[in-house]
A protein has these predicted regions:
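N-terminal alpha-helical "arm" segments
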Residues: 1-32
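Sequence/fold signature of self-assembling virion shell proteins
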Residues: 2-8, 150-188, 200-203, 210-320
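Assembly/oligomerization interface modules of large self-assembling protein complexes
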Residues: 25-93
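Residues in well-ordered beta-strands of folded domains
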Residues: 54-59, 98, 205, 266-267, ...
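Active-site acid/base region of carbohydrate-active enzymes
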Residues: 55-57, 62-65, 139-157
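Long, contiguous amphipathic alpha-helices that act as assembly "spine/axial" helices in icosahedral shell
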Residues: 84-143, 204, 295-299
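Sec/Tat-exported extracytoplasmic proteins
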Residues: 123, 127-130, 190, 208, ...
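Surface-exposed acidic, glycine-flexible loop patches that form ligand/cofactor-binding
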Residues: 191-197
Length: 320
């Protein structure tokens, strides 16, 4: 099919004819929002590459705790295995903008160069939005991805490889007391062998509307939102927690239930992943290679994001 539309003199006559003083380009400071989460962040997303368009992995059972043994007692062997093999396919994302030969050569206002800037910005926006909405935002419904045991990332019905039920779903709104309940739950979380995972709270991700509450809860010297003078343990003992926010978690850009109240705790051992088949590439195809004498600006990237397993993660929907 021959390219049509895009940037042409017919669609944007002011760009190829004299007579206007300026174009009021949109400018974005999205990435300058405080603690803005990028898809390329290597703490909230475990980064990696794929050799093909799919990524295949198993969960590991670990080896369990040591056994008490008497002198010359026959030793007990321990089974250890991998299981729940899962595959995720990488996704191609593409933007193609035709530019007529006339519009390319007669650009009076810099529209041609601006298209390149806009494509780059929208590539980053797409990466960030899709990475967050396909993992953290999807954590409670599992409508896009589930963990290898078939549950949503945040669930009270996870099953460890050795059979224990694991609950990493909480419901408390973002308050100091509820946050401590969540931190305790993360510390008490089972490992795959049914022993202590005991993950340390090191990252907090919230919709942008909860960012103020998160900062006041975490960084106040005294316990927040009360008259007591007890120390705020989150400021003293958890002072290095990464607090990040995203507009793509909130109800403006997410259709998930409880989008405005949900939040996420992670440890460094979480397995929320971003795997890249290839990064952003851009090609300008000349008009002699198209059917209607137009340039083609074609940009694309190929990647996927998904929760590899439930370990080291806890989600609260903030409903109580």
């Amino acid at each position: 099919m021959q390219p049509s539309g895009g940037h042409t003199g017919e669609l944007s006559p002011d760009a190829v004819l004299t007579g206007i003083d300026a174009v009021l380009w949109e400018e974005y400071t999205r990435e300058q929002q405080p603690q803005y989460l990028r898809a390329t962040d290597d703490f909230f997303f475990k980064q990696g590459e794929t050799e093909g368009i799919g990524f295949i992995w198993d969960e590991d059972s670990n080896v369990g705790a040591f056994e008490a043994t008497s002198e010359q007692e026959e030793l007990v062997n321990t089974d250890t295995w991998i299981g729940n093999q899962t595959t995720k396919q990488s996704q191609k994302w593409i933007k193609q903008v035709p530019i007529s030969d006339e519009a390319f050569k007669a650009d009076m206002v810099g529209k041609r160069a601006k298209i390149g800037e806009q494509v780059g910005d929208r590539a980053r926006l797409t990466q960030d939005k899709e990475a967050i909405q396909r993992t953290y935002a999807d954590a409670f419904s599992g409508s896009i991805h589930t963990t290898p045991d078939g549950q949503a990332l945040a669930s009270n019905s996870h099953v460890a490889l050795k059979g224990q039920t694991v609950d990493n779903l909480e419901t408390g709104s973002l308050t100091a007391d509820n946050l401590w309940t969540n931190v305790t739950s993360l510390a008490n979380q089972y490992a795959q062998d049914g022993e202590a995972g005991s993950h340390v709270f090191e990252g907090l991700l919230v919709p942008f509307t909860l960012y103020k509450t998160a900062k006041e809860t975490m960084n106040s010297q005294l316990a927040p939102f009360g008259a007591e003078n007890q120390i705020n343990i989150f400021d003293t003992d958890y002072g290095t927690v990464r607090i990040y926010a995203s507009i793509f978690l909130g109800s403006t850009f997410s259709n998930e239930t409880n989008a405005a109240t949900s939040y996420h705790l992670i440890s460094r051992s979480h397995q929320i992943c971003r795997k890249v088949f290839y990064g952003l590439t851009t090609a300008l195809i000349p008009p002699e290679n198209t059917a209607n004498d137009s340039y083609l600006l074609r940009s694309k990237f190929h990647e996927t994001t998904f929760p590899g397993t439930w370990t080291g993660y806890l989600g609260s929907n903030g409903t109580t």
